[in-house]
Amino acid sequence: MSDSLERYQEFTGLSIDRPDEGLLRIVIDTPGKLNAVDATKHANLADVWPVVSRDPDTNVVVVHGAGGAFSAGGDMAMIDDIMADPRYRAEVFREARDLVYNMIDCSKPIVSAIEKVAVGAGLATALMADISVCGRSTHIIDGHTKLGVAAGDHAAIIWPLLCGMAKAKYYLMTCEPLTGEEAERIGLVSMAVDDDAVIETAMEVAARLNAGSAQAIQWTKLTLNNWLRMAGPAFDASVALEMLGFAGPDPVEGVAAIREKRAPRF
């Protein structure tokens, strides 16, 4: 590992390399599980961004999933632990806030390449990126209310700004999935492209940013993200209510329904 990447050694479950000078690539990598996010990855997806922000060798970041999928969200073992252990629930509350705020505060522009599926913590990472490139048939869903908890993670801070309150309420309350094509139509993602062109397009966007004025681009991000910072209190409340929900009976039924592949009976 080169000296410029040694700072990232601790972030297991994330494959991190530098395909070009000034460009950092972060790949969520869970073989055979559509890059589901376990406890370690959840922590690392929160903690990696301050390191990126301080990295003098990085001008821009591309984040995507391994094997042609972004992420299927939190794995069931992690959800079981959140429900069972109040101390771990408090830790996940901190990590969920850190993931969002650390991406907002990361000085470097972040480009997400969203392939096949994006759910849960994976969706949070995908949509909190500064520019999101999505496959037309990519499956996007915020499944919190179907699980039996409030839509926390990232939803309250970013969906209303991206697609408007009416669409945000509809998709977050109903858990209706949407395609990348529909996500682009309502403004949830920056652009939708052919499924086989997602990574290539994201890298092209990153190359344009990498060739630009780093200071001007970083200060533009800093300025625009003040809109997100103003939504911080609503976001904090949403994550707190999500965690409160995990202490109740509804997610027990929600998890059982997922495992038994049936509709939940709340």
Please describe what each predicted stretch is:
Residues M1-A66, Y101:
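Conserved CoA-thioester-binding segment of acyl-CoA-metabolizing enzymes
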Residues T30, D55, D85, G212-S213, ...:
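Short loop-to-helix capping motifs
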Residues G65-N102, A118, G148, M230:
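Glycine- (often His-adjacent) and acidic-residue-rich active-site loop
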Residues M76, A96, A156, M165-A168, ...:
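A general structural signal for well-ordered alpha-helical segments in protein cores
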Residues L99-D105, A113, V119-M173, I186, ...:
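CoA-thioester-processing core
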Residues V133-T138, V189-A237, M243, A247-P249, ...:
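C-terminal long alpha-helix characteristic of the crotonase
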Residues E176-E182:
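Acidic, divalent-metal-coordinating active-site segment for phosphoryl/phosphodiester hydrolysis
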